Amino acid sequence: MPAARFGSAALAAAATYALQRAATRLPASITQALGRTNHRGEPVTLAEGPTTALGATLAAVIGTSGVSPRVATAVGVAGLGAAAVGAYDDVVGARPDQRTDKGFRGHLNALREGRVSAGAVKVAGVGASALVAGALLPRARSPLGAAVDTALAATVIAGAANVVNLFDLRPGRALKVGLLAAGPLLVSDRSGSAAVASAVTGAAVTALPDDLGERSMLGDAGANALGALLGVAAATRLGRTGRALTAAGLVGLMAASEKVSFTAVIARTPALNAIDRWGRRAPSTEPAAGVPTAGEPAAEVTAAPTSQRVGEPGPGAGGR
């Protein structure tokens, strides 16, 4: 990895580590709001999400500022915007009156009843920040071409934010997905996308030990932010056709998640299962393969401290 990309990864790792240490000294009220109990009955914290999101975004902004101020601004808007509304859903979505508003159907039902769910706020916030970020990325000069390019970039950014979040259902899974997705984007180019992918890599590697050790959880704040940053990296590098194909793939995965259990698919696929279980603690009460219900968006379970989806291993963020 050339010096610039190594520098972005190292800065993200250092910033994430420093924020992790600072998070241990948060006021009791904040610590309690971020506290959860996992399926083992052990305390975990959602502080991993904000610290990882901030560490990755800071390094990505610095890494791209010398390449393109517009890309650096897009990185900041997408990363911080997704982290902010994700944190809102992590905390507010844990309230008893919000626990039934899960999945897109749950958000729509809440709106029909005259309520705005925390998840709906998050979806709107991620979409809005993705649209602003997309408008800052390279686009055609004609009005119509610019509108198409912006819409495609925004779809890639918002879609990536949501898809990474879909995998935050087991310790380390979303971080591994983020690292695998960042891999191809580390190849050097002049757009600045490699610096963004490097920042995500450094932050994810730093967060991985505590996540695998079930001491902390990524939650919506972290998963949405890392996904949004990867979306910016991809949209910055790709042309219109590449953005369209990537957007279609992400939308397809989101649609599939409403019908298919990603956990069950991973459990039935030996190679994916091996990667998924690498580094994790020995299972205690995890369900057998194929038990989880269809449609398990992490955004809908990350903030529920006392309830769980049928077939998922237990209460707490990420359904863990």
Language model region names:
Residues 2-264:
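"…together with the soluble PPM/PP2C metallo-phosphatase catalytic core" -> "…together
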Residues 239-320:
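C-terminal membrane-associated helical module and adjoining short loops/tails
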